[in-house]
Amino acid sequence: MNIWVGYDTREHWAFKVCDYSIRKHRPDAIVKPIEQRNVRLLGLYDRPVDENASTEFSLTRFLTPALSNFKGWSLYCDCDFLFIEDVKDLFDMADPKYAAMVVKHDYKPKSNTKMDGQIQFPYPRKNWSSLILFNNEHPSHKFLDVNGMTPAELHQFDWIADKDLGELPVEWNWLVGYYDDLWRTVLDPSALHYTDGGPWFEETKDCDYSDLWRQYYEECLDANKVF
């Protein structure tokens, strides 16, 4: 299983705990960071620095098929995820008729700001791109131009026809602070997404599921997984 996680220098601990949470439930998972400085050095990314981007991986996530040599399936997720079930269950949902599969959220942010005081920009299909199961060999990705397309075109999957964009269960991109009121009585999250900021930020240290994240953090330290 090939897994890429967006890396931001301000969220080092979030990345490490996300990585640990994946491998806790699936020890043979291959987890790699997408670091903007590295993909620039590789010549894969040459966009100007976007001062409005909330994270360093805002657009580099769409390099996942290229980083995977356009072979097989890859999972991308933001670093503010905490996996509490085996990610293999997610890969088992991969359907080759789709170019990519996502949780198709329908929600509006509660605030104009998000993690670390960043501006919250509303747009269609918001948060769909925070977790993507990529079919790297699908012909649609020939039209994916990470350096040339606008941020809106990328985050709204404009290079993929609607019929080629599959849907994943909401449990795998559980928006912390949003979905408990809607779904908690009938569904249990499989992967928590601290989309407005997690316990690693002072201003959101007491968010929902903060104790669970800290539990994984302590386990991560004990297992010498954080460097």
Predicted regions and their residues:
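A glycosyltransferase accessory/donor-loop signature
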Residues: 1, 10, 26, 33-40, ...
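GT-A fold catalytic core of metal-dependent nucleotide-sugar glycosyltransferases
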Residues: 60-109, 133
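Short, surface-exposed amphipathic charged segments that create phosphate/polyanion-binding patches used
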Residues: 45-52, 114-119, 183-185
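Short, acidic, metal-binding catalytic loop of nucleotide-sugar glycosyltransferases
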Residues: 21-29
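N-terminal beta1-alpha1 ligand-phosphate binding loop
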Residues: 4-16
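Active-site-proximal specificity loops/subdomain of glycosyltransferases
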Residues: 31-67
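Hydrophobic targeting segments
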Residues: 2-5, 22
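Conserved catalytic core of nucleotide-sugar-dependent glycosyltransferases
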Residues: 93-155
